[in-house]
């Protein structure tokens, strides 16, 4: 079992470097290796580093979006078990990363979780959308995507974002136990079963037409203006 602890700045905001590093860490694992993914403090991940996006503009975005999708699909399709120990806020891309795990445990006082992309003004890449479609209970899927709402752990478990609410002091211990239990299953059968479960989502992720349309929206001047405004409002609140 491998413990991967996110540690990238104050909020584990997803930059190009973050995505490439996490992809590389998973690529270096043996295929059947169980993984526990967690972070420190009160934030699991605040999602995409919007400051980098707004500063880097279109040239940065054209590199970042493929790296983001590769990272998320790498975690989602890892043949071994992946358990997310969500220690704190998991917002936007941070929520998607958590939902790429097979088992999701969240600390009782772990803050909020949800996908806020619609509020930022950017569409989901197909990889992110399909991960969320797999995680969220069908009756709550449209609400979660189109409202941009974030949820308490109790609200999140009812909607499928997470599977269990755990006391903070035992979160990591429980996550390791869950990963160890899954790792004890016959690895070849586990990997194939997981691939069969994910097959429809993995097929829907292959949408070059949507990728191009999404990149066009992300790189549009009006979108970048909206992102800058969202960042400014967020900083004022904090």
List the model feature ranges, each with a label:
Residues 106-107, 111, 162-208, 234-238:
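C-terminal long alpha-helix characteristic of the crotonase
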Residues 42-46, 90-92, 106, 197:
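Short, active-site-adjacent cap segments at secondary-structure transitions
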Residues 85-91, 144-149:
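Glycine-rich beta-to-alpha transition loops that act as phosphate-gripper elements at the mouths
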Residues 91-144, 174, 178:
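CoA-thioester-processing core
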Residues 103, 143, 147-149, 155, ...:
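Well-ordered beta-strand positions
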Residues 1-38, 59, 73, 77:
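Conserved CoA-thioester-binding segment of acyl-CoA-metabolizing enzymes
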Residues 20, 39-71:
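Glycine- (often His-adjacent) and acidic-residue-rich active-site loop
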């Amino acid at each position: 079992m491998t413990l991967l602890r996110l540690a990238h700045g104050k909020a584990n905001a997803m930059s190009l470097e973050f995505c490439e590093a996490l992809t590389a860490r998973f690529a270096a694992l043996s295929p059947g290796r169980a993984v526990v993914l967690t972070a420190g403090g009160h934030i699991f991940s605040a999602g995409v580093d919007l400051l980098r996006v707004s500063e880097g503009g279109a040239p940065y975005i054209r590199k970042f979006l493929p790296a983001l999708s590769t990272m998320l699909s790498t975690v989602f399709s890892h043949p071994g078990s992946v358990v997310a120990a969500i220690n704190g806020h998991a917002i936007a891309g941070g929520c998607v990363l958590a939902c790429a795990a097979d088992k999701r445990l969240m600390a009782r006082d772990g803050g909020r979780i949800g996908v806020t992309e619609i509020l930022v003004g950017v569409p989901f890449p197909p990889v992110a959308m399909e991960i969320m479609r797999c995680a969220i209970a069908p009756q709550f899927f449209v609400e979660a995507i189109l409202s941009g709402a974030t949820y308490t752990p109790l609200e999140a478990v009812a909607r499928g974002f997470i599977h269990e609410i755990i006391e903070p002091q035992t979160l990591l211990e429980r996550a390791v136990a869950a990963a160890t239990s899954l790792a004890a299953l016959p690895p070849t059968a586990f990997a194939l079963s997981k691939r069969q479960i994910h097959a429809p989502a993995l097929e829907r992720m292959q949408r070059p037409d949507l990728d191009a349309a999404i990149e066009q929206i992300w790189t549009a001047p009006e979108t970048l203006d909206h992102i800058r405004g969202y960042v400014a409002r967020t900083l004022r609140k904090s």
